[in-house]
């Protein structure tokens, strides 16, 4: 079944109309993707085998339960818990709605792309909804030794945009401060696209001298200049059939911006010293931390090039905007450090761990250098943590002082730290009410705290 096919009208799948539900499920079984049928009261009426295999739990029957209980462990619908509810939006628009959520699964929390479509009766009334669920492989909501990692609302917004644009050929412009993970996002975009089997070629626009830029990008013919003893393909040619990632495109010299624009507009290029126009075949992804619009006003960046690369901009959040993600990222980075040590021949390499005080300190810091700064801090701390435990004294003194100032400024005597609440919420298997009782606060206070942390209350 194609995701854009119109779902045929069927009799209302009431709880007492099992033959109709079974007929709909038989239709859904043709789809290899996990799918469920949900009634207007959020109750799961049926699920296909693909859903049971991927999201089912042995001994637990999902049919008959509310979808928000199964997927989120909520005791209220998503929109009442501070989340975007695709069912509510689909009812208002009377059409397909799509959203990226974090669902509880047998493997732990996972990013899931939810596509929901209403089913109408002969009178035009919505009688049920069909949900198609696709696990997002390009990012992890759990600690991971590779790839994108995150669970905060700001991160999920960027990931959701990435998932939507990945199947297309639109040029993508990643916008964000230094250290926010632009290359990781670009690579994830490539791997989620139809060109995933092709090359992913990175062009560091800030690291190539202006005099070498053209030959590096387009290559050169034998004899094109002194020292050109043989033909050399450029990075554009190397990216054939794949993705060309222009990192820090704001650093491209003005004379080269003209040639880059011609490449994008015509889809052709010439090697330096060559006369033959060669056909380019790549998906363009660019990134910058610079204010390109201001650079256009100052005459430092071409407006026509800007509109070519800015077809689908994706703002990437700074780490300080990803409340609740510091602990997740820290554990992921520590795993990567351990893996690197093991690969280097350290047979006893194992993941380092952070004390609660150290984690609270990291969580309170503003991280002007973003994830890159967090990685540097942890790599340094690992060199001092002889027993594998990173304590607050292993962190840079200026970071500890800055964190203390921020914590004092918050005037917060809440008992449970943000870092501790994030950790508990992400491992808690129960309702929000039960979690509130465990951490000793009201459910309303818990909701407000989790919302401020960027969790959107979805972790329970």
Walk through the language-model features, giving the residues of each.
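Conserved RecA-like P-loop NTPase ATPase core
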Residues: 158, 180, 203, 217, ...
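Bacterial C-terminal helix-turn-helix
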Residues: 1-19, 47, 52-55, 104, ...
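Compact sensory input modules in signal-transduction proteins
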Residues: 101, 114-116
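Sensory modules in modular signal-transduction proteins
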Residues: 15-55, 167
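Conserved post-Walker A coupling segment in P-loop NTPases
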Residues: 161-227, 237-253, 318-324, 377
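Sensory coupling linkers of modular signal transduction proteins
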Residues: 118-156
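Terminal output helix/cap of sensory domains in signal transduction proteins
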Residues: 60, 65-108
């Amino acid at each position: 079944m194609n995701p854009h096919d119109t779902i045929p009208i069927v009799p209302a799948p009431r709880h007492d109309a099992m033959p109709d539900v079974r007929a709909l499920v038989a239709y859904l079984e043709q789809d290899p993707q996990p799918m469920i049928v949900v009634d207007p009261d959020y109750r799961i009426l049926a699920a296909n085998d693909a859903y049971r295999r991927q999201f089912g739990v042995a001994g637990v029957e999902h049919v008959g339960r509310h979808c928000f209980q199964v997927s989120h462990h909520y005791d209220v619908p998503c929109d009442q818990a501070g989340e975007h509810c695709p069912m509510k939006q689909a009812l208002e628009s009377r059409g397909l709605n799509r959203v990226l959520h974090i669902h509880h699964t047998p493997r732990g929390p996972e990013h899931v792309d939810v596509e929901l479509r209403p089913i109408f009766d002969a009178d035009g009334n919505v009688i049920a909804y069909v949900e198609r669920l696709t696990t997002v492989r390009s990012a992890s909501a759990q600690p991971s030794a590779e790839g994108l990692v995150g669970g905060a609302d700001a991160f999920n917004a960027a990931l959701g945009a990435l998932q939507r644009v990945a199947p297309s050929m639109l040029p993508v412009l990643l916008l964000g401060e230094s250290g926010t993970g632009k290359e990781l996002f670009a690579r994830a975009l490539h791997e989620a696209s139809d060109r995933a089997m092709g090359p992913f070629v990175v062009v560091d626009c800030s690291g190539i001298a202006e005099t070498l830029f053209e030959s590096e990008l387009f290559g050169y013919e034998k004899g094109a200049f002194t020292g050109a003893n043989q033909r050399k393909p450029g990075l554009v040619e190397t990216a054939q059939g794949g993705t060309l990632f222009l990192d820090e495109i704001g650093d491209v010299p003005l004379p080269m911006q003209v040639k880059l624009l011609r490449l994008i507009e015509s889809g052709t290029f010439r090697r330096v010293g060559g006369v033959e126009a060669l056909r380019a075949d790549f998906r363009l992804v660019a990134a910058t931390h610079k204010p390109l619009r201001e650079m256009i006003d100052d005459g430092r960046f071409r407006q026509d090039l800007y509109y070519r690369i800015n077809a689908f901009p994706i703002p990437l959040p700074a780490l300080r905007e990803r409340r609740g993600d510091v602990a997740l990222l820290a554990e992921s980075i520590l795993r990567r450090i351990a893996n690197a040590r093991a690969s280097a021949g350290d047979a006893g390499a194992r993941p380092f761990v952070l004390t609660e005080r150290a984690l609270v300190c990291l969580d309170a810091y503003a991280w002007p250098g973003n994830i890159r700064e967090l990685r540097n801090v942890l790599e340094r701390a690992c060199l001092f943590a002889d027993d594998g435990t990173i304590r607050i004294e292993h962190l840079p003194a200026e970071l500890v002082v800055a964190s203390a100032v921020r914590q004092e400024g918050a005037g917060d005597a809440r008992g449970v730290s943000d870092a501790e609440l994030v950790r508990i919420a992400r491992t808690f298997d129960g309702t929000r009410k039960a979690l509130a009782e465990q951490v000793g606060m009201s459910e309303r206070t818990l909701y407000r705290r989790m919302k401020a942390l960027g969790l959107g209350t979805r972790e329970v």
